[in-house]
């Protein structure tokens, strides 16, 4: 007697109307990205694990808990990509030395998360990446494209909220990390095991903790927006000005 084989847990098949909707979303995305001069790219699904350990961070949940990794016959440590940005950055670093690069992509990503409604172990992302140039207008443009895409899908502005913030410059983040570390060091006995392991190397990751005890400790923690440099505050203000001038509502 034959026994049917089910899809792997956390994955699902796309067929019929679901496939038609999927194709419509992807085609709409590329048509909008193309109007803003983003070049389509596809990077491999399989990458060296080191790429994500270095770019995403060894202490992140993505790398430490959720990534599908394996050793191939040549003893290389490979993985199924958990996100698209790192692969595009690898491509750009290997093929271009300077200039502004604009890429668009879509495809399957893989994370060993607990499956639930709207969350799968194989899921699909669409990405736009602007590499090599920094300006408030570029940040605004990406948000503008995302807003345009959502509206073109027939989702009105009152159906979603746009939340924005700023981590500031690398120097701002480093200074804030030290402040946060000093604050959290007073709660070593109360922090979760995961957060305690992040305290010395990357305390900013503790801000993402889902542990209820950690969340309570973080209520009175320093707030990064209170410690941004003058330059970073001006940069962020320009982004907000561009959004307001173009009728895009947002919350901080």
Predicted regions and their residues:
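TRNA-recognition modules of translation machinery and tRNA-sensing kinases, especially anticodon-binding
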Residues: 1-252
């Amino acid at each position: 007697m034959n026994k049917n084989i089910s899809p792997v847990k956390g994955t699902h098949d796309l067929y019929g109307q679901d496939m038609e909707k999927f194709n419509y979303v992807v085609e709409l995305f590329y048509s909008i990205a193309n109007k803003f001069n983003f070049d389509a790219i596809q990077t491999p699904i399989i990458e060296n694990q080191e790429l994500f350990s270095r770019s995403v961070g060894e202490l992140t949940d993505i790398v430490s808990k959720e990534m599908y990794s394996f050793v191939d016959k040549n003893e290389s440590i490979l993985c199924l990509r958990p996100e698209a940005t790192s692969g595009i950055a690898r491509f750009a670093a290997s093929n271009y030395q300077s200039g502004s690069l604009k890429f668009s992509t879509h495809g399957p990503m893989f994370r060993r998360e607990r499956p639930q409604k709207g969350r799968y172990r194989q899921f699909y992302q669409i990405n736009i990446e602007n590499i090599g140039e920094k300006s408030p207008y570029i940040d605004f443009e990406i948000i503008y494209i995302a807003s345009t895409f959502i509206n073109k899908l027939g989702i009105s502005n009152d159906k979603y909220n746009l939340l924005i913030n700023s981590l500031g410059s690398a120097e701002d983040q480093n200074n804030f990390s030290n402040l946060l570390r000093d604050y959290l060091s007073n709660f070593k006995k109360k922090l979760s095991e995961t957060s305690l392991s992040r305290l010395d190397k990357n305390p900013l990751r503790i801000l993402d903790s889902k542990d209820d005890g950690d969340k309570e400790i973080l209520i009175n923690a320093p707030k990064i927006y209170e410690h941004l440099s003058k330059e970073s505050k001006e940069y962020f203000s320009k982004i907000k000005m561009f959004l307001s001038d173009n009728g895009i509502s947002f919350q901080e």
